[in-house]
Amino acid sequence: MRDDRIPKVIHYCWFGKKEKPDLIKKCIKSWKEILIDYEIKEWNEDIFDINSNKFVKEAYEEGKYAFVSDYVRVYAIYNYGGIYLDTDVEVCKEFSEEILNNESFWGFEEKNFIATSTIGAKKRNKLIKRFLDLYENKSFIKENGDIDTTTNVYIVSNIIKELGVMLDGTYQRIDGLAVFYPQEYFSPYDYINCYSKKSENTYAIHHFYKSWLPLTTRIKGTIKKTVARIIGGNNVVKLRKLIIR
C-alpha cells in the first residue's frame, strides 16, 4: 500500500450489539464484493473505549448510538486514515485513484449541506482534526437535561463554510486539505423528495435508513418512498411546491 494516498481501509460503526437489519447487511455485502482489496474494520464497544470521551459516554448511556458514531468515525479516520461509511451506504464502484489521492474527500448531501455518510482522508488530516476537536469538550447532555441532537452534518457544514467553501453543491477544492464533490458522487438519493440523482459518477448511495429515529417515523418514511415509487420522485417535488404555495 502506498503511503501517499488514502489507505484502503473501510471504517464503520455498530454500537449497541443488536442484529444488523437486512438493508445494512446488503450494504456491507456490497463493500466486500466491490472493494475486494480493502480492509473492513467495525468499530464497536468492544474495540473503542466508550469512557474516553464525555460526549460518547453520555450518548452511549442514553442509547443514542448514531451520535456515538459521530465522534468515533472522525476519531478512526484521523488516527488511522481510510474511508468511513455509514452502514446504510451501498457501494456502486471502486474508489478511483483520483479520489484516493486527495488529502480528504467529502460530498454534498443536499445542495446546502456536506454529507458525513462517506468520508475519506489520509491519517492526521487537518480538517478531520478540526472536526474531531469540536467533540473534545462537548457534552451530549445539556445543562437543562435535554440531549444535544445537533447533527454532524450541520456541524461539519459550518466548519466548511468558515473555510470559504460555498455550500452550493458544486465541486470545490482546498489545496492540501480537502476536495468536495457534487451530490451525485456519494449521496445521490434525494431523501426529501424520494428520487435518485445517480449517474456514471456515483461511487456510493446513502439510503438514509435513519436507525436512530423512532420506528413510527421510519414507517412514515417507508410509506413516503413507496408513494414516490408509484407516482415518481419528480412528481413528489411538484406536489411539495404546490403545498408550499
Q: Language model features by range: what are they?
A:
Residues M1-S69, L85-R245:
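Glycosyltransferase-associated regions of secretory-pathway enzymes
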Residues Y71-G82:
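Small-residue hinge/turn detector
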